[in-house]
Amino acid sequence: MRRVVVTGLGLVSPLGNDVATSWNALLDGACGIDRITLFDVENYGCQIGGEVKNFDAAQYLPAKEARRFDRFIAFGCAAGMEALDDAGLKFEQGDPAAERAGVILSAGIGGLDMLCKNYGTLLERGPRRVSPFMIPGSIINLAGGELSILRNLKGPNLTTVTACASGLHAIGEASWIIRRGDADVMVAGGCEGSICPDGIAGFDVMHALSRRNDDPKHASRPFDTGRDGFVMGEGAGVLVLEEYEHAKARGAKIYCEIAGYGLSGDAGHITTPSTDGPGFQWPSR
């Protein structure tokens, strides 16, 4: 059985736009949750979120694409490129190793903001005024697709869309791809950018979001008896996974090894996990 290790890290978060900045802010006890500034939240029940700050998509994407793509794609590409740089991997044109390097970048919702803005354009100005980039700039698989173009990744390229588990499933599926010999390197993780009017409104009317607007720094408390919902965040977290012998042969820095991966569903409620936790038990057996 081929072994799978982690050799690269990439991160865009409410605490910083790279791994080092985010990690140092976390160690300093910083909190990235605050009042939402991306749009006017005055009439919303939930008015707080974990926004990515001071992020310029044009630093990571070609200028035209930075304007045309939803921001979740830019988050994913930024974190993916940081992870590849951290791993010391670069695949030039004509490099046969590129055919053994793939990508799985996932999201739970994808380009909701871009879709909704174009829907508004459709209603107000008609179908001919909708952006021709509405579809390619918002569909979830374009995050990995754009990264593969930017970094010449010609191996397996797919997307998992499983709500909050999307990024974890991306990493797990990527590890399986390497184990079975279909790739030597996989860039895998999740990206999301759904702090937008429709995203907040949709979760808020489900009573899924915290309304602790007067205390955003302490609003996210999932295991507290006083919890009142989750806090929407945005950003991307990406790993470079690599076959162990491949990593060792090139002298790569190895962070850890992925020992296993399991998945299941408890066939219960549409949003609420089963309280006795069978879905968490089965994959670990």
Predicted regions and their residues:
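Condensing-enzyme catalytic core mediating Claisen C-C bond formation in acyl metabolism
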Residues: 3-7, 34, 214-285
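Short conserved active-site loop signatures built around small residues
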Residues: 167
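Conserved beta-ketoacyl condensing-enzyme motif
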Residues: 6, 23, 27-162, 191-202
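Short polar catalytic/cofactor-binding loops
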Residues: 9-16
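Active-site-adjacent elements of ketosynthase-type condensing enzymes
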Residues: 41-51, 110-114, 193-220, 238, ...
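Structural signature of cysteine-dependent C-C bond-forming condensing enzymes
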Residues: 1, 86-104, 117-132, 149-157, ...
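Short, well-ordered amphipathic alpha-helical segments that serve as non-catalytic structural scaffolds
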Residues: 76-87, 143, 170, 242-243, ...
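Short beta-strand segments
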Residues: 10, 104-107, 161, 186-192, ...
